[in-house]
Amino acid sequence: MTSSYKIPKERRLQVYNTVSGSSVIVLLFWYLLLLPNGIFGKTVMINGVAVNTTNSRQLNFALFDAVEYGRMEDVRQLTELGASIKARNRFGNTALLIAARKGHLKIVQLLLDVGSDLQHQNLAGNTALFQATKARRRKVVKYLLASKAAVNVANRQQLTPLIAAAYNGDRKTVQLLLSHGADPTLTDQTGKTALVYASGKGFSKIVGLLLDTGIETSIRYGNELTILMWAAGHSDDVPSQAALKTVKLILSKGANPDLVDKRGQTALMIAAEMGHLSIVEHLLGIGAMDDVRDIEGRTALDLAESENHADVAKLLR
């Protein structure tokens, strides 16, 4: 015998009403979500990506992406839709700093026009001016300076835009920064100035520009080294002719070749130890002392021989 159970009418109505009510809620949710201007905000397409205009995170990410890739009209639209020009990425960069680094001049102009902070520093302490200078974006540098960007702000390593430009060998930007009040005497956290970096890298034209500001050649920097010593002890990646030209320029400005550093070494001794034959030859030619002994009692000849620079040692004998 089979038995059947019929759900009471009252119970059937209760189940139907529950299911129907849930369905209505779900349908209403999707209806509101898909409304172009519903309570969930307007959805716009930015470079093929749907962006909800009430979602500040989506707007700001879209702004960073548009700035990074130089999409001017997208940047304009996003700022009009409410993307924050104050928003920062994980490095502390605002849209302006990104645009400056990438060299997107028109976007830089737009962001400044809508109120971006010209002096904002990211987590490394870099300003938009520093970002543009380091990346060799001269047109952006020029515009930022014309917009009254602070020229001597240093980052967390105490690097200024002028130091960055000198390190890069960017003579025109060095000249531009100096004309807007850049201070050539400022040092980084290692005690080096723009002039020290330019001297050590053989950028003679930049050295000339910086010396023309009135800096004395006898000033000592880290480890009591003068700029002549930095030039004489240049690294091997610096072309020898560029280094020699820099040494000659510094000497022509009155540098004393016989000053010693904290180790008791002269420019001649430093050049001898590094094996820089042409510089040793030039220093000897102008009468640099070759019998000076450092704090360990070594002469230029001793230093050359200790590093197996036979050609330099032969010249010094």
Question: Over which residues does each language-model region extend?
Answer:
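Conserved ankyrin/ankyrin-like repeat signature
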Residues: D74, K106-I107, K139-V140, K172-T173, ...
